[in-house]
Every structure is written in C-alpha cells, then in structure tokens.
Amino acid sequence: MTNSNRLFYGSCFALITTAFSFSIRAGILPQLAESFDLNGQQLGFINSMWFLGFPISMILGGLFYHTIGPKRIMQFAFITHTLGIILTIFSGGYTGLLISTLLIGIGNGCTEAACNPMIADAHEGKQMNTLLNRFHMWFPGGIVLGSLVSLLMTSLDLGWQAQIWIIMITTVIYAYLFMGQTFPKPRTDAVTSVGENLKAMISPIYLFILGCMALTAISEFGPQQWTSLILSSSGAHPMVILALITGLMAIGRYFGGDIVHKYDQTGVLLGSAVLTAVGIFLFSTQTGGMVYVAAIFFALGVCYFWPNMIGFVAEKIPLSGALGMSIVGGMGMFSTSIFQAIIGGWIDSSTAEQSAKGLTGTTLELAAGQQTLTYMISFPGILIILFAILYFWQRNAKAAAA
C-alpha cells in the first residue's frame, strides 16, 4: 500500500536539502575563499558545478524513471548527497570542492526527476496542483531557513564545516521517510513507454511550453542571482530583499492549489508574467522603500512559474511522462546557466556606458544596475505575449472538446 503522505513529506525534505545546499553553500563562500585561498573565478566555477549536475541528473532520471523507478533514483540521490557533503567537509582544496559540489548538484537533480512525477502519479486534479505547489514551496522556504541558519552559525563563529553538516540532517530525514515505502504506479500505461513520451514531446504544445520554460526560469532566477550586485546601491538591503522574495514565494506556493483551481494554470501563468514584469520595472526605476514594494510584485509573479509549468505538463500533456517533466525542468536550469553570462555582460556594458557619462561610485553602480534590470524586463514581457497565446489556445481547445 502506498503511503502518499509519507512520500510527500519525504519529497519536501529532499527539496529542503536542495535549498540548503544552495543557500548554506552561498553563505560560506567567503570562508571557503579564505580557507583554500580561492579567487572569484574559482568560486564561480565551484558554484557552476551545482548548476551542471542538476540538469544532467534531472534529464537522465526522467529518461530512466519508469525503468528503475523513483525509489532507486532517490536512493542514488541519497548516496550522491552524502558523498558530496562528506567530500566538501574533508576537501583538500579547489578540485575536491568542484567534485563535491557536482555530486550535490546531481543529487538535487535526482530529487526533481523523481519527486515531480511521483506526486503527479499519486494525485490528480486540484490535489495534484495543490501538492506540486506545496512541494515547490520548500525551495524558497528552504533558502530562507538555510540563509538564517548560515547567518546565525557564522555570527557564532562556527566553522563552514559545521554548517555543511546541517545539510546532512535533512538528507538523513528524507532517506528515513522514503525507507521501505511503496511508490505509486503511473496512472496511464502508455506513460511508461519512452516512445510514447517522445511522441508527446514533439507536439506543438509541448515545444511551446519548453520555450516558455527557458524564459520563466531566467525571469525568476536572473534578478535574484544578481540582487546583491545590482541593488546594493539602491538604498535597500539586498539580503532583506532576497528574504522577502523567497518568503513570499513560499507563502504563495502554499496557497497555489486554490488559485490554480480558480484561474487554471494558463490564467495563473499569464497573471504571473504581468506581475513579474511590473516587479522588475519597479526594481529598475525605484530606490529606497519602493524597492521592497517591487520585491513584493516580483515575488508574487515568479512564485507560480516553476510548479505550474511542471503541473501543466503533468496535467495537459500526460503522455510525456516523467521524461517530459524532467526535460522541462532541465530546460529551466540550462537556460538559467546560459543567461547568467549574458546578464553579466549586460552589467559590464551598462557600467561602461554610465561611466562614460561621468558617473562614479554608488551613483554609477545604481545607474548601471537599473539599466541592466531594464533589459531583464524583456523576459517576462515576451512571456506576457506567449502566455496570452497559451490562454486562448487552451480555451479554444476546451471549447472544441466540449
């Protein structure tokens, strides 16, 4: 018998592990740089291993989901998380940190590959949308918790090794919750066929969603990744902004099921694109207290992107199966990694342009940062058009089916 509640709680703790690995590792970067005499470029490469391992294992996990099952994928996630944590703690230097971060990234990708389709197989309709949103609530929620833990432990002068051990706690918890459990079977037999999956994945609607996912992911992660650098001179505290965004995202996702049930995924995605565009526009034009208002609009916009893109695939393109969900998620992570370098180039060119106008110091930093954010408005701007098309596309499809 399948204990769906225990499996769901195990999935949540696995995603908290992912979030902790993101936020705690970010919090200890200065300590790692000091301990191992690492420069900024080396720290950047270490961080990139997290993003490299994630989509690789997510896509491979989706490909073999129905062959080996979610149980074995999560067992592999536990092994790679554990090895990554231990290797980080006992790392002798740069190479060891590269390998350990890659292993943790692989474990994180396995979590997405196994848990999304598992939740979709165990539930349907409103319940599925509710639980997918509440599952994904724990990524921003875990980032808030992890950031607070890292901040507290750093202020208590506890070493970075002790902070990494915290990630092991949630790893052991999810392993215990999954231990000995019966995992759900696919609701449709055809879903287990890779051939049927691929056939569904070359449909116009799937390819459309795949393109949208590239833009939703960078709309969400782009501004957040550069918050500290871009907004440091705006008169608002970057870490408070990040905490406000992730906290609101967690709350929004908790109540996401009811909102999706009322407005459908297409309506929610369209509204999310509008709010995200407004949020980034305010970031690019406002300073002081209004930056926090911008953060509220931005958080309410991006919080429903990821879970509802996955939920749309699960509900509207079910024959794409676990592979379809994993490819969509992988596209999100891949586009994020690609666009990071582009955004960095925008910052450099904006800084040069504003410097040529005679600006210096914090005035230069603010002008360059806000100019870069105006470029980022294009991501949700394009999505408004695409999701409006999707909204009427699906509404007409429902009318035709009726």
Please report, for each region that a protein language model flagged, where it lies by residue.
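Helix-loop-helix hairpin linking two adjacent transmembrane segments in secondary transporters
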Residues: 126, 131-186
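Extracytoplasmic
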Residues: 6-38, 116, 223-228, 339-343
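Symmetry-related core transmembrane helices of the 12-TM Major Facilitator Superfamily/SLC fold
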Residues: 161-179, 370-392
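Residue-level signature of mid-helix packing/kink "hotspots" within the transmembrane helices
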Residues: 23, 51-59, 144, 246-254, ...
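Extracytoplasmic gate region of multi-pass secondary transporters
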Residues: 25-26, 202-250, 339-344
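Conserved MFS/SLC helix-loop-helix module at the cytosolic interface between two early adjacent transmembrane helices
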Residues: 56-95
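Cytoplasmic helix-loop-helix junction between adjacent transmembrane helices
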Residues: 100-137
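Helix-loop junctions at membrane interfaces in 12-TM secondary transporters
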Residues: 90-100, 284-294
